[in-house]
């Protein structure tokens, strides 16, 4: 079940390379993110995401790949019309 719309889906080249090396797909992470499985986050970050579902602010997830590499998935805050423009998969150091 989807908790929110993700907008345009993008990923950095380094994130795609990390996914390929771990034999995982972007879709796996995006499905988890969209249904509210926030991955490897602190309780306070999880709570911030739950609040973001209500107030339209940024949504953030972190996942550890099979290779041990961490990836972030970030969905931008809603604009004035209530639309979330994009979701990006990236390495933490690319933020």
Predicted features and spans:
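Compact soluble domain cores
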Residues: 1-60
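Short, compact, well-ordered microdomains
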Residues: 59-95
């Amino acid at each position: 079940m989807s908790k929110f719309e993700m907008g345009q889906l993008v990923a950095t080249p380094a994130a795609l390379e990390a996914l390929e090396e771990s034999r995982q797909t972007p879709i796996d992470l995006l499905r988890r993110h969209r249904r509210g499985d926030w991955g490897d986050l602190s309780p306070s970050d999880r709570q911030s995401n739950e609040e973001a579902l209500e107030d339209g602010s940024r949504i953030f997830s972190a996942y550890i790949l099979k290779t041990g590499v961490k990836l972030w998935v970030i969905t931008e805050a809603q604009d004035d019309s209530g639309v979330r423009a994009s979701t990006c998969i990236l390495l933490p150091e690319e933020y």
